[in-house]
């Protein structure tokens, strides 16, 4: 069965088969984790993303990882938090489902997720963490090629949320 674990640190340094990028709809880079991934991957990533012609909220697209340790970058566009009554939970869950499906299609054995929509998109951290954990745990039997799913936390507060929801041992750093 697929192992789900928590790791606190810089997602761009993880040696996994695929990392997920919490992108904006243009896929051309932005702030937060999106900007960090684009900077670490190099200019080739922007060129590859231009060919994808953007991405809708809740969907996902894949490129090579270029200068990253990860072979692939899965770009997904999370919802902007608008109070919770505008389909945000389903759109966020869809980001995880579609990203996992692309990881499996690419033959990835390991995939790492940032906290999608938790930066400038303003999703409440507790709710976002619960959706992330629920979706990766629900989807893992369906994605048999995946041996490891890593939930990457940007700080100890988010790491502790994931850890509590997973009921797991201390966070790796």
Curated annotation (Swiss-Prot):
GO molecular function, one term: O-acetyl-ADP-ribose deacetylase activity
Recorded superkingdom: Bacteria
PROSITE patterns membership: MACRO (PS51154)
Residues of the signal peptide: none
Macro domain sequence ranges: 1-170
Record Pfam families: Macro (PF01661)
Family as reported in the entry's similarity comment: Belongs to the MacroD-type family.
Protein name: Macro domain-containing protein PA3693
Organism of origin: Pseudomonas aeruginosa (strain ATCC 15692 / DSM 22644 / CIP 104116 / JCM 14847 / LMG 12228 / 1C / PRS 101 / PAO1)
């Amino acid at each position: 069965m697929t192992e789900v674990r928590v790791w606190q640190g810089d997602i761009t340094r993880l040696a996994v088969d695929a990392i997920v990028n919490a992108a904006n709809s243009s896929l051309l880079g932005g702030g937060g984790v999106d900007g960090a991934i684009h900077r670490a991957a190099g200019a080739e990533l922007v060129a590859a993303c231009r060919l994808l012609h953007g991405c809708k909220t809740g969907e996902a697209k894949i490129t090579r990882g270029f200068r990253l340790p990860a072979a692939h970058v899965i770009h997904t566009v999370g919802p902007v938090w608008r109070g919770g009554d505008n389909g945000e939970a389903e759109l966020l869950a869809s980001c995880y489902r579609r990203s996992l499906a692309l990881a499996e299609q690419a033959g990835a054995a390991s995939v790492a997720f940032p906290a999608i929509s938790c930066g400038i998109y303003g999703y409440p951290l507790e709710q976002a963490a619960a959706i992330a954990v629920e979706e990766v745990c629900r989807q893992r039997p369906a994605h048999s090629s995946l041996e490891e799913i890593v939930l990457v936390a940007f700080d100890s507060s988010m790491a502790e949320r994931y850890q509590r929801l997973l009921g797991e041992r201390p966070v790796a750093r």
